[in-house]
Amino acid sequence: MPAPFEKGSEKKGATLFKTRCLQCHTVEKGGPHKVGPNLHGVFGRKSGLAEGYSYTDANKKKGVEWTEQTMSDYLENPKKYIPGTKMAFGGLKKPKDRNDLVTYLKKATS
């Protein structure tokens, strides 16, 4: 069972985003899709619904609503959480790293 989400360090999360996510994702409103979708407005949205991004059927069919907890669970092991996703990221195994990244994403994508 994945660890429960706990608010982390936004600053450490920003560093994690820059080193682990920025090559494929943007967070600002109106930001471009890259290899992965722009993440602005992701919280409260269902998986596979960022306008203008070509998702796999797996992402569209999963239908998960992104919350701090579901995002943390996903980031632990994306390919296990959504089998068939094209996200080529092995995941963040440490709950603290996931908490920090999700805390950053919650603010940066709002």
From Swiss-Prot:
| GO MF | electron transfer activity; heme binding; metal ion binding
Keywords in alphabetical order: Electron transport, Heme, Iron, Metal-binding, Methylation, Mitochondrion, Respiratory chain, Transport
Question: Which BP terms does GO give this entry?
Answer: filamentous growth; mitochondrial electron transport, cytochrome c to oxygen; mitochondrial electron transport, ubiquinol to cytochrome c
Cellular compartment(s): Mitochondrion intermembrane space
Say if the entry is tagged with keyword DNA repair: no
Q: Which residues bind heme c?
A: C21, C24, H25, M87
The source's superkingdom equals Eukaryota
How this protein is processed and modified after translation, per its record?
A: Binds 1 heme c group covalently per subunit.
Purpose: Electron carrier protein. The oxidized form of the cytochrome c heme group can accept an electron from the heme group of the cytochrome c1 subunit of cytochrome reductase. Cytochrome c then transfers this electron to the cytochrome oxidase complex, the final protein carrier in the mitochondrial electron-transport chain.
Which family does the entry's similarity section mention?
Belongs to the cytochrome c family.
Query: Can you say what this protein is called?
Result: Cytochrome c
